[in-house]
Structures are given as C-alpha cells and as structure tokens.
Amino acid sequence: MSAKADIALIGLAVMGQNLVLNMNDKGFVVCAYNRTVEKVNQFLKNEAKGTNVIGATSLQDMVNKLKLPRKIMLLVKAGSAVDDFIQQLVPLLSPGDVIIDGGNSEYQDTARRCDELRAKKILYVGSGVSGGEEGARHGPSLMPGGHPEAWPLIQPIFQSICAKADKEPCCEWVGEGGAGHFVKMVHNGIEYGDMQLICEAYQIMKALGLSQAEMATEFEKWNSEELDSFLIEITRDILNYQDDRGYLLERIRDTAGQKGTGKWTAISALQYGVPVTLIGEAVFSRCLSALKDERVAASKQLKGPNVNAKVEDLPKFLNHIKHALYCSKIVSYAQGFMLMREAAKENNWNLNYGGIALMWRGGCIIRSVFLGNIKDAYTRNPQLSNLLLDDFFKKAIEVGQNSWRQVVANAFLWGIPVPALSTALSFYDGYRTEKLPANLLQAQRDYFGAHTYELLGAEGKFVHTNWTGTGGNVSASTYQA
C-alpha cells in the first residue's frame, strides 16, 4: 500500500478517537493505531465508519503508511508510556520526522525528550491539548512547543483542527523545549482557580438561602456580562439540572478529585519563587474536601460564629459577589502570567503572552470573553510586567474592590470558608504595599541563623548584627531558614 496518510495518531481512547475524526473532517488522511489492535478494528467499524481514516496493525505498518516527513501524534498516558513509544518509534523513523506528544506530560519530561531526540535528528513537539472530549472532536485549544523546525510541518493540521475565536486559530507556536506543556500546565492551574472561585460564590449564595433555580438565574445573568465564560455557563446548567429525583447537585458527595496538573502548577510556583497563591489555595481546597470523614466529625465538635448569613439588600450583595469573583479572577490570571514570565526568563523561552491569551479564548475549559481583555492588555504593552498594572484591569479592580472586601469580610464573620477569594485579596493588598513586614522577618533570620540582611539605601551589601552581644559576626552557612 502506498504511503498516503498525512498524520498518524497513537492512542484510541475517546480523546484520541475524537481528534482523529476532527482531522478527518478537515480533509486530512489519518492513520489510527492503538497498542491493542482490536481497538483499531472496532474504531474503523464504528465511529470511523465511512471516513477516510485508515488503520495500522503495527508501528511498522503505521510508519509505512505515512507521507514524508512523517508526523506521529501520541495521545497516551503521560510518563513511561510516552518514553516507551518513542523508544519503539525512533528506529523506524527518518531524520526530520516529527513526534508529537499531545498528553498532559510534565514540561521537564518534554524538555528532556527534545534534547534526546535532537541528537537522533528526530523533531519533537510537546503540545498542550485543552477542551476535553468535546473540544477534541470539534476544536480544541492547542499549545505546541519543542523543536521550532517542526512547526511549519504541523501548523496546517493544528491550525485547521483547533478552535477559532473571532476567526483566529486558538493555536500558535509557544516556544522551545517544554514551553507548550508548561503553558498547558498553567492553563490547568488557572482552571483550578476559576472553579474554586465559582464554588465559593455558590457556597455564599447557598448560605444566604438562595434556591438552586435562583442561583442558576444569577449565573445566567453573570454569563451575559464580564464573567461570560464556559465555566459560568456550565455552572448554570449544573444548578438547573434535575433527574427523576429532583436536583442532582445536592446529592453529589463533596469530595473533589484531581489529576495533579494543578499541583504541578503550585509546585512550579514554589520552584520559581512566584506567589501563585490562588491556584495553591484551589489545590489545597480539593485536599481539604477529601477529608470528608474528619470534616463530618469536626463539624460536631468545633464551634464557629453564632450568626446566620443575612443581608439587608440581597440583589446588592449578589452584585458584590459578582465583583468579588471578577476581581479575584483578575488576580488569578495575573499570577499565572507572572509564573509564565519567570519560567520564560529561566528557560530562555520567548513567550507571546497576548498570543497565549488568544489560544485560550476558544476550545478550552477556561475560555472566556475575559481572555480577550488580556490579549488587548499585551497588545497595548507587550512588556507589561503584571496584568494588575494594565489600565483596563486597574479600573476593574477600582470599581469592584469595595464589593470584594465586603464579601470576604462577611464570609469570615459568617464562618464561610473562602480561601481563593481571600488569598486573592491578600495578594492584591500585598502587591500594592510599598513596605511589607519582611524587614522584621529578615531581622529574625539574622538573629537566630546569622543569615544577614540588607539596609535600605545600601542594597547589595549584606550585614549581620550581633543581636544579643554573645554571638559571633559570621553569617550562617549551614542553618537555613
């Protein structure tokens, strides 16, 4: 059989199948392969019946069916499975062929694979794929990075199958090495933050006595304003959903799962020294939710405030919640972009931040009108150091911050946990504070560990004080704090 496939895809779980069908719809001939060959046969007989998709019975068979330079996309479980397939593929490939990892790989693994395959003259791309099963079928957000020479080879396919926002593709080259998977990781972390903020708004509304129908109406209203987004939209739908037993939401166990990508973002923030506090709290909130049995026991023993959530003007307070959610969302994205900026500096990536915002405008879980405002901010000033300093976002927080403070303060007085809303406000106040109490912290470190400190006006010169008159004058070398 002559080589006629434009691209091969390995891994026929639902995401893989949907991407194959998406590529087929856009006029590309796809060769489908799965480690279990029977899955290929079933796919061709069922979901891919009547399409131009062709199957392969082995990796060699798949390679033989591909046009040169070959393009092979892996959609398999992150980790050793990716390395195993790469190891099997390399002997079958020619210099200049392209391997694309479309799974949720850790960006360090992608960077390592780029280095390893560069030496073997194979081009490698690590691409974030967002949008879930529906996005894969009808248009995902794609975030490719790796060997830049691979981009012209895969660009026609990627920009054809991806989502479009204002007729622009939600896919652009991100950067070298692990840049694509890093940006996807931050996207997932921001997703954690957005979801947690919405959950906190829901919990406050619930405490105020709103019915699910009333909450759904409020989310519907927000979705027609500045909070217009996929997650607000689906929250409305979830609140409205009823089965034969009534509203489903209240019967769902309040223990949240996680696949680890939010945790990776929080860990990266610590490694790069960037205060991505909201995503961190969103991850920890899921961890706390998992302690269901302990929380049930604690609810019977630990006392809180003896007041019920109550406001004089409910519509006005619901508007406060909307502003609090919006201001916190601005902080969350500002923190995410801070993390990407620092990682870009450390890894020599030339990231296009406005382009990244555009990539997230459609096809992905965090898609929202708000991302267009971020794109505009970086168009106005490509060197913008922080989104909070952009005129549009400054004005938005100026308008909403009194509401934000009202909501957080009342939640505290009512004993309602709002870790994401409150940490966002604390970050905002910390970021706008000229002088933080870290001078005392430095003095403490120097007192017990001789870690030294800098004096105002003498930056770069580190000094130590003998605070008790009994210690020495040398700085610490072993005790770190």
From Swiss-Prot:
This protein's record includes keyword NADP: yes
Positions that bind NADP(+): G11, L12, A13, V14, M15, G16, N34, R35, T36, V76, K77, A78, N104
Domain of life: Eukaryota
Active-site positions on this chain: K184 (proton acceptor), E191 (proton donor)
Cross-referenced Pfam families: 6PGD (PF00393), NAD_binding_2 (PF03446)
Function of the protein: Catalyzes the oxidative decarboxylation of 6-phosphogluconate to ribulose 5-phosphate and CO(2), with concomitant reduction of NADP to NADPH.
Name of the protein in question: 6-phosphogluconate dehydrogenase, decarboxylating
Organism: Ceratitis capitata (Mediterranean fruit fly)
Name of the encoding gene: Pgd
